[in-house]
């Protein structure tokens, strides 16, 4: 690898919330040594202080990176979300400041799918309430409302990476799988796509949710939808906490419209393991409540640590932004002996003309150039002759619309 414009020992990584040590191993193997590793999230004031001199930050789901936080992150180049979701990050604020955000959208899919399937089996057998009764000295030895999973209908809402893997596992246990997605998807195995949300609700013994957090999915399962689930059905949510109205779900459990539920995500979650967890579902024996641990397995966390840290290394080493959630995706092959310039700018007319004008007027030959844009930002990676890189950088940073410009190596 070519020598970077900023020595790797001076590039600071701030890793919070005890991300898996595999991330640290990847960073060290790539030559990065300035790594601050903290096992918890930080209070806002301390986060502002710590992020001020960080070039990269790694977080999980508790740390909230707001526009106000980004205002204190003058050196920040990229964010690594060591999880699936990125709703804890103000993606627009990051993009406007030229900060790329990466995540691990697929690394914990198996873990979540296994948890959902296990919960389905436990709820069909009535294990949660039988377990609770035994702990209180009771003894409910009965086959009433106790069922095998084989032959049952599973309704999957959201047929993405988790939904599809769950579909395959469920079919292997003899379930009939139906799924609803806003996009037309290729069914795996013998799964069947249905045309509306109401169809899987009304026909399924178990309904499980696997949708992202968007304006469209917020409270998409309210009282009307919960009552549309067949009587004696089961609802599982391991997606996002804002998808299900929990008060309506609690009512449906109490009046026995549903025989059980499993919830892993909540509208408001404790910031730490020492805080009190509040929910209208507490105290209901036939509801499995788990503290947002769908993807919290040793295997998933190790994979997430590897995936996200490798993306951060690639972005730091050569400017590759492939799979960024808020940034144009660029990957320019290296040109030996050349220097690489990165230019992030507002997506407005004339910027590329001005960039190329700089090279033309100063007699600088371009060895390689890759531009991509999204609705707000343009990102171009340029390889030039080594002797001209400083001159080019000096000119590029003054172009109207420039957000960030630097010599990478």
Where are these regions (language model features)?
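Hydrophobic Val/Ile/Leu positions in short beta-strands of Rossmann-like dinucleotide-binding domains
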Residues: 13-15, 156, 343
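Phosphate-binding beta-alpha-beta segment of Rossmann-like dinucleotide-binding domains, i.e.
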Residues: 97-153, 165-172, 320-325
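Glycine-rich Rossmann-fold phosphate-binding loop(s) that bind the pyrophosphate
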Residues: 159-160
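N-terminal Rossmann-fold NAD(P) dinucleotide-binding loop
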Residues: 20, 163-164
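A conserved regulatory-domain signal marking ACT and ACT-like small-molecule sensing domains
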Residues: 322-409
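An N-terminal-biased, well-structured beta-alpha scaffold segment characteristic
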Residues: 1-102, 200-202, 222-228, 371-379, ...
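Rossmann-like adenosine-cofactor binding region
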Residues: 52, 65-70, 178, 182-279, ...
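Rossmann-like dinucleotide-binding domain for NAD(H)/NADP(H)
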Residues: 101, 223, 232-234, 239-334, ...
């Amino acid at each position: 690898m070519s020598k970077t414009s900023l020595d790797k020992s001076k590039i600071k990584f701030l890793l919070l919330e005890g991300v898996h040590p595999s991330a640290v191993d990847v960073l060290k193997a790539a030559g990065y040594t300035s790594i601050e590793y903290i096992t918890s999230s930080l209070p806002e004031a301390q986060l502002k202080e710590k992020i001020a001199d960080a070039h990269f930050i790694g977080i999980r789901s508790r740390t909230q990176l707001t526009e106000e936080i980004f205002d204190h992150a003058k050196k920040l180049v990229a964010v690594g979300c060591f999880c699936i979701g990125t709703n804890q990050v103000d993606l627009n604020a990051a993009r406007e400041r030229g900060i790329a955000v990466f995540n691990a959208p697929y690394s914990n899919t198996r873990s979540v799918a296994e948890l959902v399937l296990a919960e389905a089996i436990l709820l069909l057998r009535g294990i949660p309430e039988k377990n609770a009764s035994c702990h209180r000295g009771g003894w409910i030895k009965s086959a009433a409302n106790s069922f095998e999973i084989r032959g049952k209908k599973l309704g999957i809402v959201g047929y993405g990476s988790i939904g599809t893997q769950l579909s395959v596992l469920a079919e292997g246990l003899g379930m009939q799988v139906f799924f609803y997605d806003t996009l037309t998807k290729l069914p795996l195995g013998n799964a069947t796509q249905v045309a509306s949300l109401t169809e899987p609700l009304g026909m399924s013994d178990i309904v499980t949710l696997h949708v992202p957090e968007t304006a469209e999915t917020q409270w998409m399962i309210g009282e009307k939808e919960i009552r549309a689930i067949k009587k004696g059905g089961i609802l599982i949510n391991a997606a996002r906490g804002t998808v299900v109205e929990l008060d309506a779900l609690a009512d449906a459990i109490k009046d026995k419209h549903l025989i059980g539920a499993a919830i892993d995500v909540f509208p408001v979650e404790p910031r730490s393991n020492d805080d009190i967890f509040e929910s209208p579902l507490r105290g209901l024996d036939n509801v499995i409540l788990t503290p947002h641990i769908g993807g919290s397995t040793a295997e998933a966390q190790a994979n997430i640590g590897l995936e996200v840290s490798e993306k951060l290394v690639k972005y730091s080493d050569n400017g590759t932004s492939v799979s960024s959630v808020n940034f144009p995706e660029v990957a320019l092959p290296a040109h030996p002996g050349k220097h690489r310039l990165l230019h992030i700018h507002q997506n407005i007319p004339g910027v590329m003309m001005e960039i190329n004008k700089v090279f033309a007027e100063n007699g600088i030959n371009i060895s390689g150039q890759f531009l991509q844009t999204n609705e707000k930002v343009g990102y171009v990676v340029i390889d030039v002759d080594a002797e001209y890189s400083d001159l080019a950088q000096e000119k590029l940073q003054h172009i109207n619309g420039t957000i960030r410009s630097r010599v990478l190596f």
